[in-house]
Each structure stands twice: as C-alpha cells, then as structure tokens.
C-alpha cells in the first residue's frame, strides 16, 4: 500500500495529479481537503491524489482509500523516508518536516511531468482541474503572490523585505509566493535543480519560512502568477486583513479582496485559529461543510469540543486571545507600523529565536 515511487502506485496518472504532504496527526484534515476535491471534480476528468508521508498508519490509508469512492478519483501513498536517507530536515514553531516534502516531488514522481501540490490545511471549493490546466511551459511552477508577506514588507514587519532581498537573494521581494498551493512543472524542475541541491539549501540554515523560502530563493520571481482566489489566505485571527494585508500595495489588496469574494481554494494558514479548533475562525463554515462528509467527522468534532471544554483547551484559548487580541494590538500602538523602533524591536525578537509575528 505504501510505495517508494509513483511508478509503483496503482494509479493511471493520466490527467490531474494532486500531491499532498501529510503526517498521521493531520490525516483528519487531509480527509476534509480530499472530500472537497471529490465534491467539485468534473465527471469527464481523471484525478489522482498522491500523499507523501513518513508515518501515516495502514488503518488511515485504508480509511482514506475507502473515502475516495468516485470512479474518476484515485489515491495512493508514497514513502518519503527512502528519499530522505540520513538527512534530518529542520523545523520550528508550527512548521514540521512534512512541509519540505514538496521539494522531493520531482524525484518521487519521475513519471509525472506536472502536478498540483496542496497543503493539507485547506479546502478546494471549485474544480481543481481549472488550476491544473494553467500553462506552465518554460516555468518551474505557478503560484499566487503572498499577500500576507507583501503586507509585512510594506510596514507591518519591515525586517521581512531586507531578509527576502539579502538572505534569499530575491530581485524583487514583492514577487514572493505562497507555497501552500503550487502547480509544479516537475519536468522543468528535474532539468534545472537536483533534489540534493534543494535539500542542501533547506539544511544550510533555519530559513524563516522553511521550504517556502527555499523555493522562492530558487525561483526568484520566475513563475506564472495565478489569481489569489486559488490560494485565499483566510483572515487569520480576523487580523490578517486589517493589520497586515492593509499595508500592501493597492493592487495586492484589491486582488486579495477579489479572492475573498469567491475563493476557489481556502487556505487555513497560520499558527492557530484553525476552524477545527475555533468555530468562529474565518471561513469555518466552509470547512465544516466538507467535514460533515468526512469519515473523520467524529474525531474532528471531538477535537473541537476538547479545545472548548478541557482545562488545557481553555488555557490555550485564553493565551491566544491575550496574545492576538490584546498584546498584538497594543504592540501596534506602542510601536506603530513603519517606525524604526518597531523594526528594531522585531529584529531583536527574531534574533532571540522568536517565531514569525
């Protein structure tokens, strides 16, 4: 059931190929994302889902395989440990080694020339074949600009722009893309960069946004831009739009607002405030609409109830409210956006090993 290469998978891989990276702990949310793809799939297209993993249990593989009942949708599982060898990938904060697996996609899928990579913390609210059909000839990938990061560049965190330019070597930091949704030209990537080069870059240092930084460093703005509706970043803590993206240039803000009107993919990106823990999170209703049809519904509901009823869950909620509803707004008042003292404080905080704001 667990293959070491796409060649060993019992999938035709003849049309739309979708790749996830997932651990056992995240399987319930992968199930919801998978359900959203199934419910929006066109009858005249073929969809093959490949899950890159190192620890998904046989029981979970069986459950996910049974979930995919449609005749034109298939699912298979690839073992990443064989490709990693003795390399230990760095991780910090809410990021985990699984986030690096997309770097290995060109090697793990030698018989696939084009594939969509998706994070597991999202739902697809349109036919994903439309994204797959985007022409990436001559480019390594297609992606959306990262409205959150661009908003930080423009004032919310002015250490970000110099980091992207000086550490990543980006010609224009405003070209930074969000890597949770990618249309990857695997043939192009295989011809231009080796897996060893990707992994060497990823382990050189602790990159601020991990393999997303590595991809942006390698691509350096040379990618096909797709509309942000294909990777709508949910309004995290109901602060992302008003406190961060509001600092971005007008065209970025406008595209983000257009995406919010009718998102094709809703990405629940952020260290907290996920809909399976916070029912008042942005777009939580959309998540639960698909979760209702997941075989993991009871487990997801249980996690929500635990976060609302247990001492540990309530303590975590209180901590989150204090930080994001109290401390962060107060920080913005004491150290206004765009000021030198704000930049100095953030630089010191990051230098001490602090997580991204």
Question: Each PLM stretch: what is its role?
Answer:
Residues 1-16, 22, 179, 184-357:
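A glycosyltransferase accessory/donor-loop signature
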Residues 16, 41-50, 75:
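Short loop->beta transition adjacent to catalytic acidic/histidine clusters or analogous donor-positioning motifs
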Residues 169-181:
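A recurrent flexible, glycine/aromatic-enriched loop bordering the glycosyltransferase active site
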């Amino acid at each position: 059931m667990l293959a070491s290469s796409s060649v060993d998978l019992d999938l035709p891989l003849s049309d739309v190929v979708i790749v996830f990276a997932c651990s056992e702990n995240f399987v319930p949310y992968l199930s919801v994302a998978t359900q959203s793809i199934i419910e929006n799939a066109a009858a005249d297209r073929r969809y093959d889902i490949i899950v890159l993993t190192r620890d998904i249990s046989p029981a979970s593989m069986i459950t996910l395989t049974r979930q995919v009942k449609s005749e034109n949708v298939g699912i298979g599982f690839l073992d990443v440990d064989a490709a990693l060898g003795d390399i230990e990938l760095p991780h910090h904060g809410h990021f985990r080694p699984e986030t690096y697996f997309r770097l290995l996609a060109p090697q793990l899928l030698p018989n696939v020339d084009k594939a969509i990579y998706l994070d597991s913390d999202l739902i697809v609210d349109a036919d994903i074949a439309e994204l797959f059909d985007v022409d990436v000839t001559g480019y390594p990938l297609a992606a959306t600009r990262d409205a959150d990061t661009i908003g930080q560049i423009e004032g919310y965190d002015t250490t970000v722009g110099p980091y992207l330019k000086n550490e990543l070597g980006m010609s224009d930091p405003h070209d930074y893309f969000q890597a949770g949704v990618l249309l990857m030209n695997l043939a192009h990537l295989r011809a231009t960069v080796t897996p060893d080069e990707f992994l060497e870059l990823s382990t050189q240092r602790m990159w601020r946004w991990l393999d997303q930084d590595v991809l942006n460093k390698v691509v350096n703005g040379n990618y096909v831009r797709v509309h942000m509706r294909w990777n709508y970043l949910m309004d995290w803590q109901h602060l992302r739009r008003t406190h961060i993206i509001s600092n971005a240039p007008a065209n970025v803000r406008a595209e983000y607002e257009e995406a919010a009107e009718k998102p094709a993919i809703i990405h629940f990106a952020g260290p907290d405030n996920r809909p399976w823990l916070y029912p008042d999170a942005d777009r939580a209703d959309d998540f639960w609409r698909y979760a209702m049809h997941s075989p993991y519904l009871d487990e997801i509901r249980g996690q929500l109830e635990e976060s609302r009823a247990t001492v540990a869950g309530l303590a975590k909620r209180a901590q989150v409210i204090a930080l994001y509803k109290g401390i962060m707004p107060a920080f913005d008042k004491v150290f206004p956006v765009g000021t030198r003292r704000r930049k100095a404080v953030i630089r010191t905080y990051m230098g001490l090993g602090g997580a991204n704001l």
